[in-house]
Each structure stands twice: as structure tokens, then as C-alpha cells.
């Protein structure tokens, strides 16, 4: 309808009335809620144990698995160290897995061997001491999934005598120090522990204002809140990919603490280390 300049028309003169707009808004909101709910279901962290451990959890009084030690390796070099220096002993069995989905982790599969999986969190249990669990995590755990990961993993374990050890790597460029990083003996280890962790550590403690993030930080914070003794070993390196030099930088950890009694024979270590590095080189060459 024609009108003169400056006249204010009623909103009901528009082609779509308010009731139709409200219906459209309600439909959009309902669709948004369904999308959000579907994403939440898709991003849920799921912990699966093998049938034997599932039965043990169900039969225990607190519905939790007896556990004295959890060793968590995060990233290629940390999992490479665990594969070569600990799992190569052969006295381990697949115990379970953590599966999740996010923008950087879309296909998590449980591995049947001891090589680092390309995208998974796999649990192994010591055959000689069934209370010792080891977890290799090569997949990215998104920020909104970190709390879920900690709650569901540690919610399955008896915590009364539990100790936690976490291993990971970080670019040396992120290490904060008054001196130049060029003068540092890269790679090198730093440790960060909870207030309940009383054992000596075989490397210097991480100095302020350095911080840790991701899954190691979430696990350490979770243990601090629950009063679980935990220590995190961070290897600072100038090599981003998996390599034997960075893997070997973790060797001082085998001289003390809970890892000392888990070391494999030297022959098995060297053979597995060679295979691990060679396999990574072959996979890297596929993209050249």
C-alpha cells in the first residue's frame, strides 16, 4: 500500500504475520536442539573394557576395577617409548579402549598389536601384575571431552592405592626460560606432580610460568582434586614427528618409580624401536 514519506506502518501490514514468524522460530529452535543433542551424543566419550574386566568390575563391591598404577602415554613419541621399552616385553594384554569422535579424531579402533594406533586410546593390562594398566593415546581429545575422559576412565578404577604416571611431548619453542632455547640440551625432560605424589623424580621439576594443557593437564588436575598421587613427565623436543632421539629421552624414567620394574629386555627394546620408527617413516613417505 502506498504511503507518504515518514509514516509508520503497523507490523501486521507485512507479508508474514507474527504467528507465522513464531511458528518458524519454534521450528528452527526445535531443529537446533535436535542438532545439538545429536552432536552431544556423537561427541560422547565411551570406555569399553574386555569381557574379563567387565565381569570383574560388575562383581566388585564398588563396581570398580582394582588398580595400583595407571601409565598414560599421549602422542607419538610417548607411545613410541612405551611400545618399545615396556610393551615389547610381551607380558601385556589388551584390556579395553576409549572411543571418541571430534573434528580431528573420526575413526578410533582398538589395536590388537603393540604399535601405536593412528587414532585411538587403547588400554593394556600387565599379565604379571593385573593391577597395572597402561594407556596409549594417539587421538586428539577435544577440550569439551577432557572432563568426560577423566570421569569415565577413573570412575571405573579403585582409587584407594592408585598412582598415575603421564608421559607426553611438547615443542621446545613453548618452553619459557630466561635463556635462549638454542642453548638447551634438546630433548630434555621436566616433571610436574600433584601434592600427594611423594616419590623422587629423575628429572628437574617444571618451572613457572610454564604450563601444560590438553589431556595431561586434565588428568593431573583430576588427580589433584581427588587426592590421587600423580606425576607428569613432559619431554621438550625440537622434532615434531616420531623419532628415536625423542623416544630415548624418556629412558631416565626407567631408573626409578613405577616404571622401573616394567622395562622390557634390551633385545626386545631395540627391535621394537627400530620397527616403530621404520613404520612411521614408511607412512610419512606416502604423503611425499
UniProtKB/Swiss-Prot annotation:
It is found in: Cytoplasm; Endoplasmic reticulum. GO terms for molecular function: proteasome binding. Residues 1-33 are annotated as: Disordered. It holds the Pfam family PAC1. It comes from the Eukaryota. GO terms for biological process: chaperone-mediated protein complex assembly; proteasome core complex assembly. InterPro entries: Proteasome_assmbl_chp_1. Residues 17-33 have a biased composition (Acidic residues). The keyword Endoplasmic reticulum applies. Keywords: Chaperone, Cytoplasm, Endoplasmic reticulum. One of its GO terms (cellular component) is endoplasmic reticulum. Degraded by the proteasome upon completion of 20S proteasome maturation. Chaperone protein which promotes assembly of the 20S proteasome as part of a heterodimer with psmg2. Belongs to the PSMG1 family. Forms a heterodimer with psmg2. This is Proteasome assembly chaperone 1. The lineage of its organism: Eukaryota, Metazoa, Chordata, Craniata, Vertebrata.
Amino acid at each position: 500500500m502506498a504511503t507518504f514519506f515518514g509514516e509508520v506502518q503497523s507490523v501486521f501490514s507485512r507479508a508474514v504475520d507474527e504467528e507465522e514468524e513464531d511458528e518458524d522460530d519454534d521450528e528452527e529452535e526445535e531443529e537446533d536442539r535436535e542438532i545439538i543433542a545429536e552432536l552431544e551424543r556423537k561427541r560422547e566419550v565411551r570406555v569399553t573394557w574386555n569381557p574379563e574386566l567387565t565381569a570383574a568390575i560388575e562383581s566388585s563391591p564398588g563396581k570398580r576395577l582394582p588398580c595400583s598404577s595407571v601409565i598414560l602415554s599421549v602422542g607419538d613419541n610417548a607411545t613410541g617409548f612405551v611400545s618399545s621399552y615396556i610393551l615389547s616385553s610381551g607380558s601385556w594384554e589388551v584390556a579395553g579402549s576409549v572411543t571418541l569422535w571430534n573434528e580431528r579424531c573420526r575413526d578410533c579402533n582398538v589395536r590388537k598389536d603393540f604399535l601405536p594406533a593412528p587414532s585411538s586410546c587403547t588400554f593394556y593390562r600387565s599379565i604379571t601384575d593385573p593391577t597395572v594398566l597402561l594407556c596409549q593415546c594417539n587421538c586428539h581429545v577435544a577440550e569439551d571431552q577432557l572432563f568426560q575422559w577423566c570421569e569415565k576412565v577413573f570412575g571405573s578404577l579403585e582409587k584407594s592405592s592408585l598412582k598415575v604416571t603421564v608421559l607426553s611431548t611438547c615443542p621446545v619453542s613453548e618452553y619459557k626460560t630466561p635463556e635462549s632455547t638454542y642453548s638447551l640440551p634438546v630433548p630434555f625432560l621436566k616433571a610436574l606432580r600433584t601434592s600427594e605424589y611423594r616419590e623422587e623424580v629423575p628429572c628437574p621439576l617444571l618451572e613457572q610460568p610454564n604450563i601444560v594443557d590438553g589431556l595431561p593437564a586434565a588428568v593431573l588436575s583430576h588427580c589433584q582434586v581427588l587426592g590421587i598421587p600423580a606425576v607428569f613427565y613432559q619431554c621438550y623436543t625440537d622434532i615434531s614427528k616420531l623419532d628415536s632421539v625423542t623416544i630415548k629421552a624418556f629412558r631416565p624414567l626407567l631408573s626409578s618409580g613405577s616404571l622401573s620394574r616394567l622395562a622390557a629386555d634390551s633385545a626386545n627394546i631395540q627391535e621394537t624401536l627400530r620397527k616403530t620408527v621404520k613404520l612411521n617413516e614408511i607412512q610419512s613417505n606416502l604423503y611425499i
